[in-house]
């Protein structure tokens, strides 16, 4: 089990009672694990990293991990000697067994386990534009954890499981992801309900951080560079935090991997803020965001950018950059990856591939650098060969203006 104290990622203040933010500077909470050495256990999936996960127990039926391998196909196309790919999805030939085909399973399993460890009997509440909802629906159905999903109506077709749905209620939101978050927050504030927590959820971040841990376990060192497509940027924060723990161990490298984070322009709040262009909601409304994006799961109006311990701190600390990738470059990158590596990927992951192509062409990486590319989702077509999918029905549809009666009805259902 991962024994830890909770501290502010900004000022280091000790946080009590599972606090979601620091009362001194509003910083993100961070787990300070008692175990300082990287010592993977002989347990399945991400549970092998249980010493650096904020859980007491583990569930054999959940916790599929990402798989890291050395690329030959894409590496040859880009002229790279040491390109490593972290694949989160379904690709059994590589040992990747995430049946919702997204790295969001890395968040769902430890979050569910942390909730069960508390034995509070609460119903989990999650807001999502698609991939997160799918992962939590799968994991909670397997473990019989009651779950309420708030999903934009436009994203409902992405919500499916490969198991019979459990105690999962799907609420279609007339609005975007930000509206789904607002409604989820209202319900989560009421007795008997527990918010998933977003970027402030240490189980979510440390679960995603296992992408970096798997690379270190397999290849015995930290990479020089790390590439990922981001929406909120929480995945980048997670890898930064995991890297600091590895460096403290002292056996696998002394320098942080340089974070190369990518967003899908023009709907790119983190990219805009990093480059000093602001992030006004009116700007995104003018572009029709998130409609028209190569993958709208990468759009988050309110990312944890400037908060202590957030995206800005992570990128400044690692000394690299944030990319803006338009649709045409993402489409080309997706074709390049699928052709060279032989597996289908989710559109969001292609934005990271495009950033890597950009970095190679611009000379930001050297041919012999160790590079870790996070393919955050893929294998949907491959999954169809082995498993059927069960589409979750929408139980009710609500908007911000007419939500109170609906939320009261939900309370009665889960009372």
From Swiss-Prot:
Residue positions, PTM N6-(pyridoxal phosphate)lysine: 104
Entry GO MF terms: cysteate synthase activity; pyridoxal phosphate binding
GO biological process: coenzyme M biosynthetic process
Oligomer and partners: Homotrimer.
Binding-site residues for pyridoxal 5'-phosphate, renumbered to this chain: 131, 376
Cofactors (names): pyridoxal 5'-phosphate
Function in brief: Specifically catalyzes the beta-elimination of phosphate from L-phosphoserine and the beta-addition of sulfite to the dehydroalanine intermediate to produce L-cysteate.
Catalysed reaction, written as an equation: O-phospho-L-serine + sulfite + H(+) = L-cysteate + phosphate
EC number: 2.5.1.76
HAMAP family attached to this UniProt entry: Cya_synthase
Keyword presence, Transferase: yes
Domain of life (superkingdom): Archaea
Organism encoding this protein: Methanothrix thermoacetophila (strain DSM 6194 / JCM 14653 / NBRC 101360 / PT) (Methanosaeta thermophila)
UniProt keywords, alphabetically: Coenzyme M biosynthesis, Pyridoxal phosphate, Transferase
Family: Belongs to the threonine synthase family. Cysteate synthase subfamily.
Name of the protein in its database record: Cysteate synthase
Pathway(s) per entry: Cofactor biosynthesis; coenzyme M biosynthesis
